[in-house]
Each structure stands twice: as structure tokens, then as C-alpha cells.
Amino acid sequence: MTSPNIDSDTERTVKIQPIDKFESMARLDQFEVIKKIGQGTFGVVQKARDKKLGNLVALKQLINHSAKEGFPITAMREITILKRLNHKNVLKIEGMIHEEPKTATPQDIITQRGVFYTVSPYMSSDLVGLLENPATELDVPTIKCILQQLLEGINYIHQQHYLHRDIKAANILLDPNGVVKIADFGLARVYHGQLPLRGKGPGGGERNYTALVVTRWYRPPELLLGERKYTTAVDMWGVGSFLTSWAHQTEKTGPRRHFSRNKPDLNIGLTCKRTLETRFQPLLGDTGADLLSKLLTLDPKRRYNALDALDHAYFTTDPKPILPEQIRRFEESHEIDKERFKRLRTSTWSTEHVPKRPRAEQERNDRSVALIRDGNGMKPPTGPLAMKPDYF
């Protein structure tokens, strides 16, 4: 039986980089699992330490829901693509682990499944965690540095003829040295057509793909309207969504209506006045609001590509972006910590906003406490609190 062709017929028309092979399969007992840092439909991501080398890694479990299905195609696609890509802002897979199923009978061989893990460098934070953590403040030079690195990574991906198709805050990671890593290539695909060029619009757009990609809250309007010959512009919308997330200090821009494909829906944008620039100018400044408007342009043909965005004045006006190594060390913050951070933020807000009693009432209460502490409750206090006891 031949293995599945994850790139369809792309090898005939697109230059594909050779895949670096894994030297060998590791074993799970070679690692000390520390804690869970992520969870989703794919399985669980755990922080672990290599017992021999001592370095921290992330173990991503690949769930296979049925032994009859074989190796998950999304996982195979992600691993294959990541082995082809080599860029400082793209997460690397350093190895694989396969845990054999525990079989006691021949029937178990059919029903039981082995478990695969990918081994990647440990990333101390993702942007959902950083945005939700009340103890973390991402200032303008820091966010410019993060955004610049994100755009450099996306530009590299697009120049290699790939669509990521799931750019969102949870898939943008930060290592302890301040280097951004783009992760989760399970939805990535090779695209056909021209590459993105400065001032020339997006790349691709020559083949049909499913429109059911990109997490819905980050999904661009062309996908909501059912477009199938989409371009690299779908990834750029996700960059703009992240920028609004930072501006609001939240992990998402809010749910958008999932439009039907009826023709009347296409007139919605023609009857509404665009307010994005005026709404975000106080938060991002003139150049930031202008960049955001270029990233969130409704027409994908006019939307900025990564090269255009990197050339924008936002990155050359003060305050300028700092270097990755200048980003201060943050508390470990991941998407899985989001609910804990929300509770912490709510608790902090409640403590800081407890209504204060009126001064006269507070003084009366203080005098009451002083009388009680006197022992017999009869001797009034002296000094500033020696006022008429109007509380009797």
C-alpha cells in the first residue's frame, strides 16, 4: 500500500525542500514529565525534561482515535512540513516518540493503539497566556518586536509556498530568549500561484481548498463567505486579529457572524461605515491604526502581505521595536492557564475596587472597636477619636 500524498500533486509544480529525517525514535521514559501545558483535540502537550541532556522540551501527544485509521493525516502533514521548513521563527520538531500499545491477546493488537509524541524545544509562553496574565504588560516596543518576528516567520512560510491557515494567538509561542515561534501546522498546505511580492498583493489563489479552516474568531471574511480559491491573505488577517487582541488585552477579537453564501450578504460591507481606524487610533497611534487597517482590509487582494507589513512605518517610528534578547523574562503563561488568570484578574479587580465607607462612618466604627478593646466597653478612647458617641 502506498503512503498518502499529503501535498496532492504539488510536487510537479512546486519546488519542495528535502525532508530531514529523524535519526532515531526516542522513548518516553527518557523524559521526566513536569506538567501539562496544553490540551486540544490532538491530545495533550506536556512540559518535560530530557533526563540525559537536562534541557526542557515539549511533548505533544498525537491522538489516533481508531487503530484502523493508521497515523493521523493532519499529524503527518504537520511533521512533514515542519521538517521541510528551517527558520528561526518557526517551531522545529527535534524528534519523535512511539509508545507501543499494551497487548495481552491477539485481539488487543487490533483494538489497542500505540501513542506517538513529537519532541520540540520548550516554549515558556504563548500569546494567549501572555495577554491573559494580569501580571504581564506587553509595552509598545515589546509588541512591535513580537509582531515583527511574527511577520518574518509568516513571510518565510509564504515564500516556501505554504499556507498556515490557523494563525492565532495560541499558535504564536515565545521562548525564554524572546524569540517568536509559529506553531501548529496541522492545517497547513502547499499553495499554487505567484509568491507574495512587495506592493503586489497576496500569493496563491489558483487552486480550490476547503473554507473550513482557521479558528472561527480569527477567520477572514472571504472564508466566512465560502471562498475556496483563497490566498496567503488568510494568514495576514490572523496577524491583524492578534494586533487587536493586544490592543484590548484579550486573546480574541470576539465572535463574528458566520455568513451564508447568499448573494445579498455581499452587500453588507457596502452599507456600513468603516470605523476601525478611529476606534483603534487611541490605542495604537496613527501608524499602528494604519497598519491594522491594511491587515484587516476586507478585500483580500488589497490586504497587506507580510513584506508590505514589515516595510510599514509602524516599525520605524518611536517607540521603536526592541531586540528579542531585550524582551524581559515573563512568568510562564500558556493558553491552559487562561481560566486561572481570569480568576486572578477578577479577584485583583474586586480587591482594588471595594467601595470605601464614608469617613464619618469609618470613624464611628473605629471608636466602637476602641471601646470594645478597652475591656469593659465603658472607657472611651482619647485623642482624635474622642468624639461624641452618637452610635448609642
Where are the predicted features?
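C-terminal intrinsically disordered, low-complexity extensions immediately downstream
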Residues: 320-391
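A conserved loop-to-beta-strand element in the N-lobe of protein kinase catalytic cores
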Residues: 101-121, 128-129
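Activation segment signature within eukaryotic-like protein kinase domains
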Residues: 146-147
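C-terminal lobe substrate-recognition/regulatory segment of protein kinase catalytic domains
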Residues: 246-291
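Catalytic-loop of the protein kinase fold
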Residues: 158-175
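Conserved HxN/HPN-centered segment at the entrance to the catalytic loop
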Residues: 86-97, 106
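Glycine-rich ATP phosphate-binding loop
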Residues: 44-64
